[in-house]
Amino acid sequence: MPSQKFENLLNLALETSMEERDKSLELNVGYEREDNTWELIVKYHGDLRQGMSSFFALPQRRLLQIEELIAGYAIMTVPESFVDALALVEEIEYIEKPKRLFFETLQGKLASCIVPGSQLGTTLRGQGVLVAVIDSGIAWRNQDFRNTDGTSRILYLWDQTLQAGQIRERAVESGLFTGENSIDYAPPDGFYSGVEFNQAQINAALNASSEIEGNLLVPSLDTSGHGTAVAGIAAGNGGTSGDVYAGVAPESELIIVKLGTPRANSFPRTTELMRALTYIVRKSLELRRPVAINLSFGNTYGSHNGTSLLERFIDNVSEIGRNVICVGSGNEGASGGHTGGSVGITSNTTAGTSTGMASGASNTLVELIVGNYESGLNVQLWKDYVDRYRIRLISPAGESFTVDTDKAGKQTYVLEQTRILLYNGEPAPYLTSQEIYFDFLPLENRSYINSGVWTFELEGIKTITGNYTFYLPSETVRSEQTRFVRPTPDVTLTIPSTASKVITVGAYHAALEAYADFSGRGYLYQDRLGGRIEGSFIKPDLAAPGVGIIAPTRAGTYEPVTGTSFATPFVTGAAALLMQWGIVDGNDQYLYGEKVKAYLRKGANPIRGEREYPNERVGYGALCVSASLPG
């Protein structure tokens, strides 16, 4: 039976067979078939372990893990047979399953007012500030991340994808690590996964007699090069280029988290991001140093209004210690994965009471093109809970069903050769809007869902706001042809850039001085689910160069990269410079968090073609660090 303590997606997953979950892009995220366990995000109060004490007496207790994070959040790994009982634990307030994260990949320093020879190019170089990059790892041998004496600028590297036991076995087999040379490979304190390397271990690997020996000492690789490029833009020293391609904060020291899991062929999860943020903030507090944190990835699942556990967790993290968290707005602006509008407002209605006649409301058709060879697809429909709709889904061949909107929970339908799992959600303790979730799966004898134009017909029965919005999965996991016929680019920023207290970064083309159309758009003084947006809740906050940015590669060279992934580290590096000026240099001990955001907003430059500021494309304008410094 569905629990109101569980999010909609978790309820649907638990009510769906393993065979059907395997066909879904989303429902099995967090489930481990080998152990029959779920990884879950938990919001709790009080003593969680005490509240869970009875579970540790059960036969399957060996599979139970609790990782307490910060601010009343935890990640739990539990046998599937335990999950329903979690709803009875008084200390647990709410539970969500993980979501997948996608890297946002598709002459910035001068455009961002960081001029060589100025104060920003000489005295402000990130000294005394930590730059933390949560990404695909780093090419730790690269000269861009080493001091002039050859030692590493990386203080800590946590590779979440490595397994300590396997690395230890290889080390023993190699014959290199005996006696005083042995290394105790282990996760960071308080965590169960991955391997942590410190600066001394990285330096030992750099000084090894051969590259092979060094790679045995620190077997962490950035296989995509994404994290290396991001770290280079934020904090590389341009060592391979003679400082020509130095990053924004080239004398900062680094904390790197390679996001992921030992599972093969899998995307990173939101749970791994939450672990990474907890780890970095704890290190910052331990080292008593300010930290600028860079996140260059996101996903499209959620209401996009800052209410998910991940978004609220990040807002809580931003208030611990002296940190700034910078997040890219994503590359979904022109992907066709979002649409929205209004079915109109019915007449003779009083909020929460009578139904009335629909004079202002009308039937609305939302058409979705599904490309060939889609093995599965999910669609989110978000609406105001007070509004009542009649919703009909029509297949490409004209078959249809009408959603039973009076029945909460799971519903199952079949149109043509496609099974549709539907979950009619309810409000949650942290969410006033309603989600209706559709998961399109091929029938047992097919590999793909039906292609063609699928139509959602919306009819307002009693509508107070009439607003609706649809989201598809990230363009990374759907075919190029799959998109809405009439997409809307607004509110296409990805989660977690929707968190209130992060600095959300869009991208612009510095050479053309123009907004980059792929950059995820936000919202500004407009109606959205749950009411009007507060004036202070504006996304994105500003934009940075994100097209053709020269960045270091894992091979030790440089190449151009494009995407909000590579706009974000400009702002992360800028935050490090402001915190150096304020905290390290003693000009303002309180220059972190929202104060850095305010200064960067105030110093932003106009962008060609943008008439009003702030706006939903570039926020307050283009990053300009020199104008953001006080005085």
Language-model-detected regions and their locations in the chain:
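Edge beta-strands of jelly-roll/beta-sandwich modules across compartments, strongly enriched
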Residues: 436, 463-475
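Catalytic cores of secreted or luminal carbohydrate-active enzymes
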Residues: 293, 310-352, 619-625
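Hydrolase catalytic cores
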Residues: 231-234, 242, 255-262, 281-291, ...
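Autoinhibitory N-terminal propeptides
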Residues: 1-72, 79-121, 130
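Extracellular S/T/G-rich loop segment that most often corresponds to the catalytic His/Ser-adjacent loop
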Residues: 160, 191, 200-202, 320, ...
